[in-house]
């Protein structure tokens, strides 16, 4: 999922050269948008990454599923582009990274968000939480990422695990665990949920979704979206 410089890392390399290798991590980029008004607080510069494990039946970014792309960019290249539009952001705006599933490129995300904070740029992670696990090495990397994350927009596809599997092809257990962990760590969250006729708009499911959200301490907003019936598989 990542591109690295083709240099053999040996103890004999000067420290500066070793640092240059580390900072040459490149993200697989799907697309960029300069003016996002509904993707976090304020006006956001949007970075869509390639690759997603889930196969949501109502997905409107199907072309981001495949991780393959020739569009590779470093964190500094992206931030240089983003800062051209900084005058629009005001006090609340910044960058939002989405996908695809951004957490599949967590090493790149850490580099991007760390450098964004060094430039005083607000960071927002838009994720389904599907890659989340408390197992290593992901868990340590996730905690490192949170040091530079100002907001997480977490998309809960379905509160019922079996229905979630039908809808996305994956369990929701680690996604709900991700929400709990973010709350435990004091990370501000916006919860997103899509109302799909006949699938997620059931009163019982909505009640359970609300009950789960009520157990979280750091939810600032809940955003409901509507979608037509899912496409034929």
Task: Enumerate the predicted regions with their spans.
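Conserved small/polar residues in nucleotide/adenosyl-binding loops
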Residues: 225-232
